[in-house]
Amino acid sequence: MTNIRKSHPLMKIINSSFIDLPAPSNISSWWNFGSLLGICLALQILTGLFLAMHYTSDTATAFNSVTHICRDVNYGWVLRYMHANGASMFFICLYLHVGRGLYYGSYMYTETWNIGVILLFAVMATAFMGYVLPWGQMSFWGATVITNLLSAIPYIGTDLVEWIWGGFSVDKATLTRFFAFHFLLPFIIAAMVMVHLLFLHETGSNNPTGIPSNADMIPFHPYYTIKDILGLLLMITALLMLVLFSPDMLGDPDNYTPANPLNTPPHIKPEWYFLFAYAILRSIPNKLGGVLALVLSILILIIVPLLHTSKQRSMTFRPLSQCLFWLLAADLFTLTWIGGQPVEHPYVIIGQLASILYLSIIILLMPLTSLMENHLLKW
């Protein structure tokens, strides 16, 4: 008799995706982040669902409902901080996952890569809308500033902003629709993750060498299930340390002040995971130019496969490209730091230089270095 996991219509799909899936024998811990992201998404949906049971999306009661969750709901504070810091873990895993893709040339699987970039945009949109929900000062002003950027679009900008707001300012209608979309998007993301995996399983995983590994594959279970569990334990440990010891470390103190349209906070800034893009936005003095740079800072990932000029897929054996990659990583840390600083000298010029460097590494320096490496290897 055939094993049920190989014959049952539903079990068959799970089996071919997570159990008998052929995987390269040499993939490192950098390949753990895909499964960690799946777990992060599940955790966010679960904690978010329970938070939504107690949250009210009304300007008069939103702030108090979050306070009520923390004070009166059984383990409500755990739910709230798991959800808030879970988002931070989500983005740490996301950025490491994208970084892995850039380093090892995984972007050559263009369908998987492009769906991944769309997923990145969707997660960023979800996180932004979630940040508005507690209706603190930074929630309100963050929503006002970021949505107002759309007014830079010629001709339709102002109408578009008022349409998104549902009025002439960020108000009751805005909060309600942001809650609706914040609840809906994670399920759309989950569906897109399925498509992401579907395309990945068409080609199979890449590996650190960048060389096809069809001749040397091992089953996903038990080898990579146990390896993923180790990654999961480390991530859960980090998350619990954050939630139980310093839950507000990554948040903004201004968000403990209820939203007040008449009082602007001295420094309006988003959560830490958006600071690099915020720094790029601020480094251009023109409003429309800044908005375009902001979108391009992420959208640039779409054209990375087109800019691949090397005859090798991975950076494992390309020391010059490795230097550029780590320069790019350092540049992103610099941009993140600048995004959290006030708009004054010397932060402005540092931000502008870091923004120019970010774009030039990806568009210009990486492809040129790859060509040079080809030449050095007489290819």
UniProtKB/Swiss-Prot annotation:
It is found in: Mitochondrion inner membrane. GO terms for biological process: mitochondrial electron transport, ubiquinol to cytochrome c. InterPro entries: Cyt_b/b6_C, Cyt_b/b6_C_sf, Cyt_b/b6_N, Cytb/b6-like_sf, Cytochrome_b, Cytochrome_b_C_euk/bac, Cytochrome_b_N_euk/bac, Di-haem_cyt_TM. GO terms for cellular component: mitochondrial inner membrane; respiratory chain complex III. Its main location: mitochondrion. It comes from the Eukaryota. Heme b b566 binds at residues 97, 196. Heme b b562 binds at residues 83, 182. It holds the Pfam family Cytochrom_B_C. It is a multi-pass membrane protein. Keywords: Electron transport, Heme, Iron, Membrane, Metal-binding, Mitochondrion, Mitochondrion inner membrane, Respiratory chain, Transmembrane, Transmembrane helix, Transport, Ubiquinone. GO terms for molecular function: metal ion binding; ubiquinol-cytochrome-c reductase activity. Its cofactor is heme b. A ubiquinone binds at residue 201. The chain crosses the membrane at residues 33-53, 77-98, 113-133, 178-198, 226-246, 288-308, 320-340, 347-367. Binds 2 heme b groups non-covalently. CDD domains: cytochrome_b_C, Cytochrome_b_N. Heme 1 (or BL or b562) is low-potential and absorbs at about 562 nm, and heme 2 (or BH or b566) is high-potential and absorbs at about 566 nm. Component of the ubiquinol-cytochrome c reductase complex (complex III or cytochrome b-c1 complex) that is part of the mitochondrial respiratory chain. The b-c1 complex mediates electron transfer from ubiquinol to cytochrome c. Contributes to the generation of a proton gradient across the mitochondrial membrane that is then used for ATP synthesis. The cytochrome bc1 complex contains 11 subunits: 3 respiratory subunits (MT-CYB, CYC1 and UQCRFS1), 2 core proteins (UQCRC1 and UQCRC2) and 6 low-molecular weight proteins (UQCRH/QCR6, UQCRB/QCR7, UQCRQ/QCR8, UQCR10/QCR9, UQCR11/QCR10 and a cleavage product of UQCRFS1). This cytochrome bc1 complex then forms a dimer. Belongs to the cytochrome b family. This is Cytochrome b. It comes from Myotis lucifugus (Little brown bat).
